[in-house]
């Protein structure tokens, strides 16, 4: 089954990625992806786009050739307080806010520090999805994070790239996260974390973990465009109302 939604992609605006929005649209058409989010790295990363890049995402059309585009960011969790590198009224202009740990911004520390930072980001109300929480470089209290995610309605990502090109050794942590999410009622989402358009919608490794723990697929945000849009609307993203009529034939 091809899941029709991808929440995590990077364009040439993050200079260690290699595809344009046009490239992603072309691959989306080929693969049957109906909705994807463009989520370049937050401005605290050395090669991230300027702050204005995210402000001006409003110029992107809502849909091109039947493919919807979400305007987003993969922000950086900066400190133990869970602060991220995108803020203020600008956050409300985005459709989706991802956030995670990245070594150049928040060097790995200890389990207690990582857990506190991640839970504070979850509690902040500013973050919709925590990216690659299974990164072995950042050990966390998985049950505590999953419980917070369930309580505050934040999704946890099973990052497909973590099993292929980066964050080697993530399998055990991601399996534990999926199990905890199932037991505690947290929402999961699969992210390709594409840095080149060819991997858009590539979820094979992430899906194998989700299936191994028997996580309910009717809770996966990738299951349909409306499932994700409803989730984002419930989290206060009024901007996604523009997209909802375009998927009026969709079953959440």
From Swiss-Prot:
Example GO molecular function: phosphatase activity
UniProt EC number: 3.1.3.-
Pfam families with a match to the protein in the record: PHP
Positions with a binding annotation for Zn(2+) 3: 74, 102, 132
Gene Ontology CC entries for this record: cytosol
This protein's UniProt keywords: Hydrolase, Metal-binding, Zinc
SMART domains: POLIIIAc
Residues noted as binding Zn(2+) 1 in the record, renumbered to the chain: 8, 10, 74, 193
Top-level division of the source organism's lineage: Bacteria
Residue positions binding Zn(2+) 2: 16, 41, 195
Keyword Ion transport: no
UniProt-listed GO biological process terms: bacterial-type flagellum-dependent swarming motility
Note accompanying the cofactor annotation: Binds 3 Zn(2+) ions per subunit.
Disulfide bonds: none
Cofactor: Zn(2+)
Family: Belongs to the PHP family.
Protein name as annotated: Probable phosphatase Shewmr4_2619
Native source organism of the sequence: Shewanella sp. (strain MR-4)
